[in-house]
Amino acid sequence: WLMVLGARTLDDRGEVLLYRGDTLDVWTLVGPIAGSGRGGLGEFGYMWECPDLFPLGDRHVLISCPQGIAPQGEDYRNLYQCGWLAGHFDGAQFEHGAFHELDRGFEFYAPQTTQDSQGRRLLFGWLGLPEENEMSQPTVAHGWLHQMSCPRELFWQDEWLCQRPVAELEALKGERTRFEGTLGEFPGLAIDSAWLDLDLCGEGSLWFGAVAELVWQQGRITLRRQNWQRGAWETRSSPWAGGRITVLCDRSSLECFIDEGRHSLSA
């Protein structure tokens, strides 16, 4: 058996530790396989949480959540980050490339994956950051807090880790409405939930009620939302190569898959 464990060293460096065990009761430390100051990352957070190491195709992927990374322009905008490293794992060492954010939205953390009976690698993420805002969430009055993401299938596209809603969600679709051509405005739709496939060009925006807006312009997709605690508008954005955008929305959340799943934005 192999186990990966997120860690924080005594000198505040985040690491992912590898353990090996003949049973699930007794484990032996093999050593760190990734972390701050390792694999060409430089200083990269004081703690790494929630690691998940798995094979996908002919490579291995390590998903983890570093804490203590400062924002860099439009990157690393959340309190804690979540991303992936791809490379080769030989059972003891993990040679990998650069760190990439798994979801560039407001709330996405601690994802875990599993392999299903069809051999697909499926991921669920936790939509629930940051914790200092938890008790101000309006759902607290109704006895619940946070939610899981939709189940996502992971796949490679041009050596990039991509995500898409699992095919089984297609069965939940109801009546279809189609808009074609160039539209300055189209009528508002009163819906509780929707699956939107957007083929866009030029510049424009799509409102979700009065509290969230998806904005597209050359090379960039931006998700704006009104913070429920402060009332201020805040943004997260992603590169956009002009490909299809799929949005899953309901009363509580938005999950946007950009360029056929190359990037995602959740809120």
Where are these regions (language model features)?
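Short consensus segments that form the blades of beta-propeller domains
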Residues: 8-11, 41-44, 73-78, 142-145
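Flexible loop/turn segments at secondary-structure boundaries
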Residues: 10-12, 38-42, 52-54, 61, ...
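Hydrophobic core segments of beta-strands in well-ordered, beta-rich domains
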Residues: 1-11, 16-19, 29-31, 50-54, ...
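Residue-level preference for beta-strand/loop junctions
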Residues: 12-13, 45, 192, 241
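Surface loop/turn signatures of beta-propeller and other carbohydrate-active proteins
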Residues: 5, 26-52, 69, 92-109
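Conserved Ser/Thr-centered positions that define the repeating blades of beta-propeller domains
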Residues: 20-24
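Structural motif
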Residues: 12-18, 70-86, 132-134, 150
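Beta-rich accessory regions
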Residues: 82-267
